[in-house]
Amino acid sequence: MALERTLSIIKPDAVAKNVIGQIYSRFENAGLKIVAARMAHLSRADAEKFYAVHAERPFFKDLVEFMISGPVMIQVLEGEDAILKNRDLMGATDPKKAEKGTIRADFADSIDANAVHGSDAPETARVEIAFFFPEMNVYSR
């Protein structure tokens, strides 16, 4: 097991449902520490840059529109195997396929409005964390 950090975003649909606290409880109950957090309303430019890896995909425009539709909660999670733990907590991208008890099964409405984002690998996590948080604003506890 490795101590890792991962980026998590609670997307506009889940923020609008007022379930930030319930999602944070799941992180903490799984042994993940929230070592940085902020609320933001992403600009189109930031959303396009953050999701640039998907720029050629057919869903890119809809993804950007959704991510700028309301505020998001962005956090860095730290813990043993944080990336995998967070991905297990989130569940499948499509909430209809997500296991019962996962964040997406419980709070997401569709494959587009799917409540949360999480880094998928250590290198992705490093890039995504640096995008939203200068290193001096992330604190181990």
UniProtKB/Swiss-Prot annotation:
Q: Which InterPro entries match?
A: NDK-like_dom, NDK-like_dom_sf, Nucleoside_diP_kinase, Nucleoside_diP_kinase_AS
CDD domains, sorted = NDPk_I
Location(s), subcellular:
Cytoplasm
Question: What EC identifiers does the entry list?
Answer: 2.7.4.6
Q: Which positions in this protein are listed as binding ATP? A: K11, F59, R87, T93, R104, N114
Question: Which Pfam family, any one of them, does this sequence belong to?
Answer: NDK
* Cofactors demanded by this protein: Mg(2+)
Q: Which processes are annotated in GO (biological process)? A: CTP biosynthetic process; GTP biosynthetic process; UTP biosynthetic process
- Chief subcellular location equals cytoplasm
Keywords associated with the record: ATP-binding, Cytoplasm, Kinase, Magnesium, Metal-binding, Nucleotide metabolism, Nucleotide-binding, Phosphoprotein, Transferase
Instruction: From the UniProt annotation, give the residues forming the signal peptide.
Output: none
Source superkingdom: Bacteria
Q: Which GO terms describe its molecular function?
A: ATP binding; metal ion binding; nucleoside diphosphate kinase activity
| Listed GO CC annotations | cytoplasm
Q: Which residues form the active site?
A: H117 (pros-phosphohistidine intermediate)
From the UniProt record, list the reaction(s) this protein catalyses: a 2'-deoxyribonucleoside 5'-diphosphate + ATP = a 2'-deoxyribonucleoside 5'-triphosphate + ADP; a ribonucleoside 5'-diphosphate + ATP = a ribonucleoside 5'-triphosphate + ADP
The function of this protein is: Major role in the synthesis of nucleoside triphosphates other than ATP. The ATP gamma phosphate is transferred to the NDP beta phosphate via a ping-pong mechanism, using a phosphorylated active-site intermediate.
- Family (UniProt): Belongs to the NDK family.
Q: Which NCBIfam families match?
A: PRK00668.1
Q: How does it assemble?
A: Homotetramer.
Name under which the protein is recorded: Nucleoside diphosphate kinase
Q: What is the organism of origin for this protein?
A: Burkholderia thailandensis (strain ATCC 700388 / DSM 13276 / CCUG 48851 / CIP 106301 / E264)
